[in-house]
């Protein structure tokens, strides 16, 4: 066994090493946005990590045992904008702890048991806009050192131990403050002196939340001549009398929005009546909301006598036993009744009302006509209402309506095509039960409608003119309905401005090839949750703006006729997930198309085979099908490839010979311009010019020669000139053989073409002139030329008087063969397939 001394000698250095390793190196922070946002929550850090980039802007250090923040704790993060230090067990914050964070806009200190807060704790935060100090053991605003934070807009000190509502003098420096949350503190009384700073330096945009404070007294005049944007008092009063007294203490307050009431399941009041709100007559209120009063209110109209002139009135979760009527005496422009309990649908006669929100209410299932001549916005959703007849101007008492939401209601019988409601722009019927939708053109009058939702309305489309009149419609949602014979006909012919169309869950199996032809502006099309068995791309060829096409959750096995070329080029996202792909050889081209289009397909990795059974559940991308083809097909295919290859090689090799053949066929009976086409090396051009041309063209009879330096057409390929200007327009060919000729590729090329020319035209002749002795070893390299010179008569140039005489006599005789000559000129005989020419 290891001795105790040796064990200690091993453990002590190991423990020393481990103590030096920082925990932040063991548990790295999560990089949410590279170099910008890092989440270091619950990593057991006891100090600020220094292994993050200087460019970090958003840092979450919540739930780490930091306990103490010293000066310049965040010196390494000069670009920081959002810092979350929630529940870090921080007890002490020293002077300059946030120094250097000049860009920080949000600081969250929630849930820290702060015991020592230095006067300069928040120094350096020159851009701070939001400070959250919830549950920080704060006992007073007086000692909270934030008076220098002139950019502060939101201060949240809820759930603390603050007992006095007195706003310190430094609030006069917080000129940008818009929201002060003092909810869930210990404030019981408000005195005039508490709000002195608001008299001296009014904060006109300030929203003040005093909810969940045990209020029992507000000194009359405390809020006199004070202007607030919003005041919230919920769950503040334990009795009706206290509530009445405190509301009277608000006399003289001018507030844009006042919120009174309680929270769900947290009510303190035992009863509530109209006297509670009598003090509101002494306030100037623009918008009023009363929330969560679970009491049966008998005379609701009398309850709000002091609120007749507010512009917006809202009741949320209030139980109302009876309502006489909302009459013309109220000057409200916006009325909101949400989640309330009514005995019956209220009678509404409000001349100035522009917006009515009546949603999620209970009781009064039958809709009764209203008289709202100025109404522009009407939300009657989620009430279970039934409409015996809909919809026209007489139902709502207005011709100004632009927004109508009747979703999540009961049976709605369509008996009118919106006469008098031609200004409608938004119409929502989703999850209501529509009757008589396919009996006539319901929407014929709605030429200004932009948004229409008839999803899950039990509509069965059997009339092609159902959407006639909707010429301005941009969004159409009709999911969860059905079509006659599960076939989509041409019902969108007038919807030329449509950009969004939802046809999901409509049990569709087929669609007309021209169903979408008029939708050139369509960008999003949802065809998911239907019963299509193949992907037919033809109907989408006219959708030039389409970007998103969803065909998920159908029964697609393959593409129709394996044709996929009709998808518009604008398409960016195609969803084919959760379909019944057939992974067989028969559909191999479609499966390969899926692999090729993986950039276009959404969640392509989720596309799996459904058949055959041995490949069920296998991702299409990982599929590798080996298809056995018929041996005959393989043989024919291979033979075809070989034949095509051989033909291509022969055409390539004998291209110019074929060109010559084509020329002979074309010019076969034409007239020759030249007596001979001269083939020679450019090195022998002096002899050709001084001897050959001079003696033949200036002699008697004269002969016309074709020479490349003189007679070839500029700008035409050399090979084309040789064939068209040389061979096709000449009776004979003169070949000037020399060592230079043998070594020239162009000369050999011309000679080979000349052989083909002689073969094709039986009247043609080749005259060989050996200009100088040629080495036999060099001549043997050109086998055909060597063989011809060995078997045929040729002319040999001799530079002597007798040799010249014999040379020119023999050459003229060869050229005269087949030539008609008279003193007036020279005329060729033309192509003659019966004549033969020889030397």
UniProtKB/Swiss-Prot annotation:
Gene Ontology MF annotations: lipopolysaccharide binding; lipopolysaccharide immune receptor activity; NAD+ nucleosidase activity, cyclic ADP-ribose generating; transmembrane signaling receptor activity
Keyword Disulfide bond in annotation: yes
Glycosylation: residue positions: 35, 173, 205, 282, 309, 497, 526, 575, 624, 630
PTM text: Phosphorylated on tyrosine residues by LYN after binding lipopolysaccharide.
Start and end residues of each LRRCT domain: 579-629
S-S bridge residues: 29-40, 281-306, 390-391, 583-609, 585-627
Localization per record: Cell membrane; Early endosome; Cell projection, Ruffle
Keyword Signal: yes
Major subcellular site: membrane
Signal peptide: 1-23
Annotated Gene Ontology cellular component terms: early endosome; lipopolysaccharide receptor complex; plasma membrane; ruffle
Family: Belongs to the Toll-like receptor family.
Protein name: Toll-like receptor 4
Organism of this sequence: Pan paniscus
Phylogenetic lineage: Eukaryota, Metazoa, Chordata, Craniata, Vertebrata
């Amino acid at each position: 066994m290891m001795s105790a001394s040796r064990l200690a000698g091993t453990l002590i250095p190991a423990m020393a090493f481990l103590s030096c390793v920082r925990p932040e190196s063991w548990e790295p922070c999560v990089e949410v946005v590279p170099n910008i946002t890092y989440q270091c929550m619950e990593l057991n850090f006891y100090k600020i990590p220094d292994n993050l980039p200087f460019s970090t802007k958003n840092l979450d250090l919540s739930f780490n045992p930091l306990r103490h923040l010293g000066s310049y704790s965040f010196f390494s993060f000069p670009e920081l904008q959002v810092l979350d230090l929630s529940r870090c067990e921080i007890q002490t914050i020293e002077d300059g702890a946030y120094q250097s964070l000049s860009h920080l806009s949000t600081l969250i200190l929630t849930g820290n048991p702060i015991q020592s807060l230095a006067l300069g704790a928040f120094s350096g935060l020159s851009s701070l806009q939001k400070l959250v100090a919830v549950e920080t053991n704060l006992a007073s605003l007086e000692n909270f050192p934030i008076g220098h934070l002139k950019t502060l807009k939101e201060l949240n000190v809820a759930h603390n131990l603050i007992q006095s509502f007195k706003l310190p003098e430094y609030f006069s420096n917080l000129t940008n403050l818009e929201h002060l949350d003092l909810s869930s503190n210990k404030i019981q009384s408000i005195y005039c002196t508490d709000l002195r700073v608001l008299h001296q330096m009014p904060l006109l945009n300030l929203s003040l939340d005093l909810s969940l404070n045990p209020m029992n007294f507000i000194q009359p005049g405390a809020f006199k001549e004070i202007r607030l944007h919003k005041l919230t008092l919920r769950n503040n009063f334990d009795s009706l009398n206290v509530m009445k007294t405190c509301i009277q203490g608000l006399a003289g307050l001018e507030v844009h929005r006042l919120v009174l009431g309680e929270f769900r399941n947290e009510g303190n009041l035992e009863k509530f009546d109209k006297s509670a709100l009598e003090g509101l007559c002494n306030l100037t209120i623009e918008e009023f909301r009363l929330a969560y009063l679970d009491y049966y209110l008998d005379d609701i109209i009398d309850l709000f006598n002091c609120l007749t002139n507010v512009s917006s009135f809202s009741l949320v979760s209030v139980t109302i036993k009876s309502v006489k009527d909302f009459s013309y005496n109220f000057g409200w422009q916006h009325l909101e009744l949400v989640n309330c309990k009514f005995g019956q649908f209220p009678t509404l006669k409000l001349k100035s009302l522009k917006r009515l929100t009546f949603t999620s209410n209970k009781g009064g299932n039958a809709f009764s006509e209203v008289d709202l001549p100025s109404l522009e916005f009407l939300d009657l959703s989620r009430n279970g209402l039934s409409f015996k007849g809909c919809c026209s101007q007489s139902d709502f008492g207005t011709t100004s309506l632009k927004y109508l939401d009747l979703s999540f209601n009961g049976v709605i019988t369509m008996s009118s095509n919106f006469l008098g409601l031609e200004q409608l722009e938004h119409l929502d019927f989703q999850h209501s039960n529509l009757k008589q939708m396919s009996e006539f053109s319901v929407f014929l009058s709605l030429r200004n409608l932009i948004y229409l939702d008839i999803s899950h309305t039990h509509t069965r489309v059997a009339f092609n003119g159902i959407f006639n009149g909707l010429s301005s419609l941009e969004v159409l949602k009709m999911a969860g309905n059905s079509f006659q014979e599960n076939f989509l006909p041409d019902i969108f012919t007038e919807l030329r401005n449509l950009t969004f169309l939802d046809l999901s869950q409509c049990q569709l199996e087929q669609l007309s090839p021209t169903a979408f032809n008029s939708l050139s502006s369509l960008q999003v099309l949802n065809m998911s949750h239907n019963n299509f068995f193949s992907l037919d791309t033809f109907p989408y060829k006219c959708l030039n703006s389409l970007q998103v096409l969803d065909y998920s959750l159908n029964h697609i096995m393959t593409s129709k006729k394996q044709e996929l070329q009709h998808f518009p080029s604008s398409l960016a996202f195609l969803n084919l997930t959760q379909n019944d792909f057939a992974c067989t050889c028969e559909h191999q081209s479609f499966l390969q198309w899926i692999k090729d289009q993986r950039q276009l397909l959404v969640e392509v990795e989720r596309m799996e085979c459904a058949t055959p059974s041995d490949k069920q559940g296998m991702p299409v991308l990982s599929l590798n099908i080996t298809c056995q083809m018929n041996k005959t097909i393989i043989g024919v295919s291979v033979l075809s490839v070989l034949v095509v290859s051989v033909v291509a090689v022969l055409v390539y090799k004998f291209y110019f010979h074929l060109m010559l053949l084509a020329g002979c066929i074309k010019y076969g009976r034409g007239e020759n311009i030249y007596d001979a086409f001269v083939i020679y090396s450019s090195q022998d051009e002096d002899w050709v010019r001084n001897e050959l041309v001079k003696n033949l063209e200036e002699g008697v009879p004269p002969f016309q020669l074709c020479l490349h330096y003189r007679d070839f057409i500029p700008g035409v390929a050399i090979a084309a000139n040789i064939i068209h200007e040389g061979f096709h327009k000449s009776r004979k060919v003169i070949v000037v053989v020399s060592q230079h000729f043998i070594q020239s590729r162009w000369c050999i090329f011309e000679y080979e073409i000349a052989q083909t020319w002689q073969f094709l035209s039986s009247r043609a002749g080749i005259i060989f002139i050996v200009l100088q002795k040629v080495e036999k070893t060099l001549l043997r390299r050109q086998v055909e030329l060597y063989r011809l010179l060995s078997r045929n008569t040729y002319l040999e140039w001799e530079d002597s008087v007798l040799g010249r005489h014999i040379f020119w006599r023999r050459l003229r005789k060869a050229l005269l063969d087949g030539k008609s000559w008279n003193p007036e000129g020279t005329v060729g005989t033309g192509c003659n397939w019966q004549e033969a020419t020889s030397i």
